[in-house]
Amino acid sequence: DGEAAPTAEALMRSRYTAFALRDEDYLFRTWHPRTRPAPPYWVEGTQWTGLRILGAEAGGPSDEEGTVTFVASWRDVATGETGQMRERSRFSRRAGRWVYEYGAND
């Protein structure tokens, strides 16, 4: 399973990398089962090109919940179109490990 992310922001960063690398197993393990959709977890043809963390509330090593607001940049590999998505993600601890619950477009 690997080492648990110490903060919600660390989990956010690792999940972005998992989306970019299409690591479905990692995304599955770090998604709260109550809110986890069926795979695949990405849009085919999307290449993730950057992540900028805008802020985090709580989500520290001693917290049980936290939020991370970020902007992720993407490119459509077929058309070359580029764009960004902004999200405020909610995280919580489950069995002592941070998991992603849900996100809202910010």
Residue ranges and their predicted role:
Residues 16-19, 26-28, 70, 91, ...:
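Aromatic side chains
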Residues 1, 23-25, 63, 76, ...:
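Acidic-enriched, low-complexity/disordered segments with a strong bias for Aspartate over Glutamate
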Residues 83-106:
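Short beta-strand edge/turn micro-motifs at domain boundaries
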Residues 31, 48-50, 98:
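Tryptophan-centered motif/residue detector
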Residues 32-36, 56-62, 95:
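Rieske [2Fe-2S] iron-sulfur-binding subdomain
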Residues 43-84:
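Surface-exposed, charged secondary-structure patches
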Residues 1-44:
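Core segments of small alpha/beta cavity-forming domains
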